[in-house]
Amino acid sequence: MPVNRSTFLRRGVAVVAALPLLTLAACGYGSKSDSKETTKVAAGAKKIDGLDSVKIGYFGNLTHATALVGIQKGIFQKELGATKVSPAIFNAGPSEIEALNSGSIDIGWIGPSPSINGYVKSNGKSLKIIGGSASGGVKLVVNPKKIKSLKDVKGKKIATPQLGNTQDVAFLNWAADQSWKVDAQSGKGDVTVVRTDNKITPDAYKSGSIDGAWVPEPTASKLVAEGGKVLLDEASLWPDKKFVITNIIVSQKFLKAHPKAVEAVLKASVEANKWINANPDQAKAAANKQLEADSGKALKANVLDPAWKSIQFTNDPLAATLNTEAEHAVKAGLLEKPNLKGIYDLTLLNKVLKAEGESTVDAAGLGTS
């Protein structure tokens, strides 16, 4: 795969990665999840692939609820037997990709933009997307006193989580569709893009330093709880209202060395999604309980309930939409047209799905040949 002159945000990644790396420095690349009760090894269980542990990364977001629920309900641990689940929580994609590249994690739940970036920067050698997890859960929430219609967004200050992340690309693309000009790197133009960590965004909104935000759940619902109004649900911009927000990646080195362990994690993911979709209220509570275990703070009902309703949990990686998101990044000037052929390896996922009697999924022409 050829080297791209301008890989996804080569300038921005170093900057936006700095904050999460600082906050996680005490724990390496990701903070460790305190999930002792949910990672207990059953008596008589055997190790998979001779591994002592499998290191799993994810974000403390509801869009990563497959991982949250899988850990909280002990589903990952059940499938891995005596191989211990070792969870790590991240705040941003670049730090999770760095952790995957260094071997600090083996498998991760992550958004499409950092997946693309990690693959492109490594010339297609670092990772594979091996499954889907979630669709939706992204909204443009605004101050209704300042913004009453979509056209009012022009001239305002809108937050996105970080330069070049999935929501940043989506907002820049939407702004371009309105014929507004914005410098992608600086965020300045007909609308000002303010890159703000999701943890800080609600306070920035309350202080008036931003007029709205294009953000994932639960941040979007936190803003609504502060008086914000949902002006646009990103799902409305996509065919069938479906687009990838979270997929599953694995280190290519780990995939080659330990396919049985990867298959076990994928089986657990499929089981978790099945349980989530069959038991939405219980699943919502389980995800919130894991968020509390990881961060020390659970979400309030007025945030949790609306946030949960806007997310769809699926094993389908929605590969065609990832390709479209890459095209949006190219359009925004954040990425030269990449060669994503081979970014997916859905072999093990489809093996699991067939065994479970479920429909297989495809890579939209971007799979391993």
Predicted regions located by residue number:
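Short, glycine-/small- and polar/acidic-enriched structural segments
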Residues: K36-V194, D211-W214
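Pocket-lining segment of extracytoplasmic ligand-binding domains
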Residues: G187-D190, K199-K289
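Short, solvent-exposed loop/beta-turn-alpha elements that line the ligand-binding surface or hinge
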Residues: Q77-A82, D183-S186, S236-D240, W308-L318
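Conserved C-terminal helix/tail region of periplasmic/extracytoplasmic solute-binding proteins
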Residues: E327-S369
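Bacterial signal peptide processing site
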Residues: G28-S31
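Bacterial N-terminal signal peptides that target proteins for export
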Residues: M1-V16
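Secondary-structure end/capping motifs
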Residues: K256-E336
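C-terminal motif of bacterial Sec signal peptides marking the signal peptidase cleavage site
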Residues: L22-A26
